[in-house]
Regions:
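N-terminal secretory signal peptides that target proteins for export/translocation
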Residues: 1-10
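Compositionally biased non-globular segments, especially hydrophobic aliphatic-rich helices
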Residues: 7-8, 21-26
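Hydrophobic alpha-helical segments, especially transmembrane helices
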Residues: 11-12, 409
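Bacterial N-terminal signal peptides
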Residues: 13-23
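Acidic/His-enriched low-complexity segments
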Residues: 24-272, 298, 303, 401-407, ...
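Hydrophobic alpha-helical and helix-loop surface patches within well-folded domains
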Residues: 79, 89, 205, 234-432
């Protein structure tokens, strides 16, 4: 029975990870397979007064076949200078933007040979008010902050990129901003130096592990934090001024969740630190950026002494969901958005487990039953859809973030776990 169950698990994982991958390649509208990125070096200089930012970018890439063109995702970007270097020569690129498709084609006179190449770009972008890309928000006192929200297809609004989940690369981020403003990103700070202007400082961050562009994150503003740790991993909970003590419960929850996940998974948390920030202006409930999770304030900050049990449950479960994404989605990522259920379904299935161990009196196992029933009801409607569904455009991709990708996918995983047994299923998950 044990061996048979393991065989079933293996076949199911193969179907999820292989057959659906072939399906997404067949149907999805993608960047041409001309080159792949290896690394990005990015410098951002936000200007809060003009609602703009200056950007400078160097992309190290590998050209796959001879070509005179490289296509990047790009939206709301004003290019100032673009060059491509290859085989010892540097050429100015001619640009052909396509606003409808949100791409730009970089053309050079001398074809690029297969092998390494470097794209260098100077540009400006918009600190928009649309809560996507690189945008401006305000706290209750009217103080501005700049923050990113890139999932699913909005990294291209902050820097020209291979803005698809399959194109993983490392990122080196530098931010030049006002000397009194804090800067947070995915990795640890490596330096914080005054200048170049008299009222500025320049903050540099360590090279990230390879990751998808939608997981890059930056926040710049008047922020403060409380801090702790779990399994020697530093954890900080950030807020706008005057609210840092409201992060104590979230910090405690994150410490508990980190310890649970490090025991559950065969790979311990791989990112060195975890920052979490609650923002007044944030469109999503939360976003699982690698090593730096962003939240809507109400889903991270609360008064531990006076908050209801339901409010605490909501915060704890959202934290557990986003931290589960550090493995499901960040470390292991779907090839294309057709399979977003693999990200969201696994994180939703996982979210109650550490909280049930930490707070058994909350009976989150009963909540799982209720959630499964709600998913069954939703899936009985005439307008339901398959878990795996093709999506080509940004608008179609956004539509996939629904109750099917979260609730139904999690319900299917709970069913498989129940059939195979928790330990067999866990062993299969750890082999993905």
């Amino acid at each position: 029975m044990q061996n048979a169950a393991k065989g079933i698990m293996k076949r199911l994982l193969w179907l999820c990870g292989t057959v659906l991958t072939f399906a997404c390649f067949a149907s999805a509208q993608r960047l041409p397979e001309i080159a792949t990125p290896e690394s990005y070096k990015l410098t951002f200089t936000p200007d809060f007064d003009k609602d703009k930012f200056a950007g400078e970018e160097t992309i190290q890439l590998h050209v796959l076949k001879p070509t005179s063109e490289v296509v990047l995702d790009s939206a709301d970007i004003e290019f100032q200078e673009v060059t491509i270097a290859s085989n010892g020569s540097t050429q100015a690129a001619k640009l052909t933007p396509d606003k409808e498709k949100e791409i730009v084609t970089l053309a050079v006179d001398k074809p690029l040979a297969p092998g390494p190449a470097t794209i260098h770009v100077k540009y400006t972008g918009i600190l928009n008010d649309q809560l996507r890309g690189f945008y401006l928000g305000k706290d209750e006192q009217g103080r501005k902050y700049a923050v990113t929200q890139f999932e699913a297809t909005d990294a291209r609004r902050a820097f020209p990129s291979f803005d698809e989940p399959a194109y993983k690369a490392t990122f080196d981020v530098t931010v030049v901003t006002g000397k009194d403003l804090a800067v947070i990103s995915n990795s640890n700070q490596t330096s914080d130096l005054p200048g170049p202007g008299p009222d500025q400082h320049t903050v540099r961050f360590a090279t990230t592990p390879k990751m998808s562009s939608y997981l890059l994150a930056i926040a710049v503003g008047n922020f403060e934090y409380v801090e702790g740790s779990a399994d020697s991993i530093p954890i900080r909970v950030w807020s706008t001024p005057g609210k840092k003590e409201l992060g104590r419960f979230a910090l405690q929850a994150a410490e508990q969740v980190m310890q649970y996940y490090n025991r559950y998974f065969s790979i311990k948390y791989p990112y060195g630190k975890l920052d979490m920030i609650g923002l007044p202006d944030f469109s999503a409930g939360a976003m699982e950026n690698t090593g730096f999770i962003t939240y809507r304030e109400i889903l991270l900050l609360l008064d531990d002494e006076h908050a209801s049990v339901n409010a605490k449950k909501n915060v704890a479960v959202v934290i557990a969901h986003e931290m589960a994404h550090q493995w499901f989605g960040d470390l292991v990522t779907m090839q294309w958005w057709d399979d977003i259920w693999l990200n969201e379904g696994f994180a939703t299935w996982m979210e109650s487990k550490p909280i049930q161990v930490w707070k058994p009196e909350w009976h989150l196992d009963l909540d799982d039953v209720q959630d499964t029933n709600q998913s069954l009801n939703a899936d009985s409607l005439a307008n339901t859809r398959p878990i795996h569904q093709a999506a080509n455009t940004p608008a179609e991709i956004v539509e996939l973030f629904d109750g099917i990708a979260y609730g139904k996918a999690a319900a299917v995983l709970r069913m498989l776990e129940s059939y195979l047994g928790p330990e067999t299923f866990r062993a299969g998950v750890n082999r993905i």
